Amino acid sequence: MIDLSTRWPSPAKLNLFLYINGRTENGYHELQTLFQFVDHGDELTIQANDSGEITISPEIEGVPLKDNLIWKAATALQRFANCSYGAHIDLHKILPMGGGIGGGSSNAATALVALNYLWQTNLSDDELAEIGLALGADVPVFVRGFSAFAEGVGEKLSPAHPDEKWYLVVRPNVSIATADIFGHPDLTRNTPKRDLETLLNTPSVNDCEKIVRMLYPEVDKQLSWLLQYAPSRLTGTGSCVFAEFSSKSEAETILAQLSDKVSAFVAQGRNISPLKETLAEYQSASHRPI
């Protein structure tokens, strides 16, 4: 066990496009989507110990410990690896919950990757992704740490290298239930499947966007405003929307025009996750037990 206090990023992600191609017999939606990380997110400070207990601070209001995805990830790793170590985890939370940018899934993946290193359980990315999939469909993307083209019901991942553009990400003050969007009778479910090269050279669309804009006027209003300045769309099922720019200064110029009451940030796309880069830094710095 490595008992140093270590800091780990928990980055946000964007769905640069999202197409719904059909439905499986058991009701899941078949889709094609492109995940890219951004250099903005939460941070976990983790101190491994031999208590066997997982403690997290501060508590997330309205979320009992055993419903916290970080706790679920840590205890799932303990069980999978038959590990008796524990940890105290401090969460610095800046990503919104339920925003479509992967906040909870990213937290779970960061816990898995960090504790696998600190506890020296030596599980592979495939094994960590298997644990993560039981926690949430997006967790494996964060575990693997590369931008990915996802197909099927989201389980088929292949590396992708979209341009690392600058993004202005805005969160309208609404909470959107994914089930409500995927269950809506008017949702497009028959977009033809295309290969990644074709999709990268086609204007990007999110098939959920039309329904979300219809049901949530705040999202529609924010997207209409962003579209005046740059290509913009919904990420996931929302509520976050984003505009893409070729430079940081362009994105920050538009950010400055937003009301102080609007939650927003500027970030750059990253095809290698900041989490993966941090793991490599710790591994190369010879943080080893004495």
UniProtKB/Swiss-Prot annotation:
Pathway: Isoprenoid biosynthesis; isopentenyl diphosphate biosynthesis via DXP pathway; isopentenyl diphosphate from 1-deoxy-D-xylulose 5-phosphate: step 3/6. The active site is at K13, D138. InterPro entries: GHMP_kinase_C_dom, GHMP_kinase_C_sf, GHMP_kinase_N_dom, IspE, Ribosomal_Su5_D2-typ_SF, Ribsml_uS5_D2-typ_fold_subgr. Its EC number is 2.7.1.148. One of its GO terms (molecular function) is 4-(cytidine 5'-diphospho)-2-C-methyl-D-erythritol kinase activity. PANTHER family: 4-DIPHOSPHOCYTIDYL-2-C-METHYL-D-ERYTHRITOL KINASE, CHLOROPLASTIC. This is 4-diphosphocytidyl-2-C-methyl-D-erythritol kinase.
